[in-house]
Amino acid sequence: MAPNAADKCPVMNNAAEKCPVMHSNGVSSIQSHGPRDIYTLEALSHFNREKIPERAVHAKGTGAYGEFEVTADISDICNVDMLLGVGKKTQCVTRFSTTGLERGSSDGVRDLKGMAVKFFTEQGDWDWVSLNFPFFFIRDPAKFPDMIHSQRRDPQTNLLNPSMTWDFVTKNPEALHMTLLQHSDFGTMFTWRTLSSYAGHAFKWVMPDGSFKYVHFFLASDRGPNFTDGSTAKIDPNDPDFATKDLFEAIERGDYPTWTANVQVIDPKDAPKLGFNILDITKHWNLGTYPKGLDTIPSRPFGKLTLNRNVKDYFTEVEKLAFSPSNLVPGVEPSEDPILQARMFAYPDAQRYRLGIDHLKAPIRRKETSCKHDLGPEFDQWLSQVTSESWSHPHEDDYKFAREYYEVLPEFRSQEFQDRMVENLYKSVAQGPEDLRKRVYETFELVSTELARRVREGAEVIVADMAQPDSPERAQPGQQRL
């Protein structure tokens, strides 16, 4: 019997256009009329284009799938379909990230951490784009590029240079509150599974009659805080992906991380009585810790997020993920927070650059829905009628919130907690030139005389030691991350 012709043929692979290719692991020689190896040329051109630009911010990250379950009835304040009905479940995908540095940088850098969740609701995608702190460095979106650049690599040396950050902070005192928190143990990275995240911005939850409440929602890790007495002993300094590996391996073995969803609520008529602008993202809504003298705005738990499945293709399922705070569903509207308004433009615009104009057709985004995505009408009456704000200029509250955070730490956490924050501050400040250090001390004087003294004394001791030729403290500027 004649052998089957197919048995003599090499294994065939499909090219990009679904055409069979006989020898995908070898190149055809040049024929008398020129090269004809279309597959090799196609493979090379695809290789040259297979990567996409990294994110402008939050470039380093990882992700996983999960589900959200409603655990409490909040129908008295909320008309979002996904949140109506105890026990109702919604599938989602989550991405964790650092903020300022590039892909390949360490999970453990002392900067903001992101936790973005895309809920695949019956009415379309709803994105929670959150950070591990409930407030931010700036309230004026025009300052955002400078703020991010100040936390990146020095454009001359390509090294990390804390002086760039301190130059920004001393010129923009609204960043002091965030800077103190970032240098405390709250800014110490441990694992993604212990990261709590906060939407930060005020949103509106709108009822069917058109009334609304201002809300802050956040996800509190059920595993506790993202630090252990300031210790990072379990973190391998030689493994920049320690948190990424920890999350993946935990889900693989069935140790699913969970978060409790909480919401704080403010009635618009109560906003003028609170003593600060609730739309200023450099301030937080007091949960009962600080500032003293301001009303506590309690939180209500209403749901549980569980991550229970790892991705199979990181590039397609995580790198091509696109989040935006503008991805809302009926019953949710943005507030008038200027940073939020700017982000609602900047995120989709960044995605059009990074992923192309057809990024909404990516498989991770293909969610069928029979509901229109346009929101209800915007309301003419809003908070600006009762609260005026100059978003660019310093206010006394910029120093007050930072001052009260510093002063409450021994009671709220411990004296050692406060001491470690001060140590992190002066180690960072010490790397700057004398004129910048002086400006930092003067800025801290406006927060707390004691804080300024402690930072000055600690930094100048390090500077004096570094001046010694044989000092082990000597280092090139920019070698230590903030």
From Swiss-Prot:
Pfam entry (one): Catalase
Entry keywords, A to Z: Alkaloid metabolism, Heme, Hydrogen peroxide, Iron, Metal-binding, Oxidoreductase, Peroxidase
E.C. numbers: 1.11.-.-
Listed SUPFAM superfamilies: Heme-dependent catalase-like (SSF56634)
Keyword Heme in annotation: yes
Active site, UniProt feature: H58
Biological pathway: Alkaloid biosynthesis; ergot alkaloid biosynthesis
Cofactor: heme
InterPro entries: Catalase, Catalase_AS, Catalase_clade1/3, Catalase_core, Catalase_haem_BS, Catalase_sf
CDD domains linked: catalase_fungal
Enzyme class: oxidoreductase
PROSITE patterns: CATALASE_1, CATALASE_2, CATALASE_3
Family designation: Belongs to the catalase family.
Role noted for this protein: Catalase; part of the gene cluster that mediates the biosynthesis of fungal ergot alkaloid. DmaW catalyzes the first step of ergot alkaloid biosynthesis by condensing dimethylallyl diphosphate (DMAP) and tryptophan to form 4-dimethylallyl-L-tryptophan. The second step is catalyzed by the methyltransferase easF that methylates 4-dimethylallyl-L-tryptophan in the presence of S-adenosyl-L-methionine, resulting in the formation of 4-dimethylallyl-L-abrine.
Protein name: Catalase easC
Organism of derivation: Arthroderma otae (strain ATCC MYA-4605 / CBS 113480) (Microsporum canis)
Gene: easC
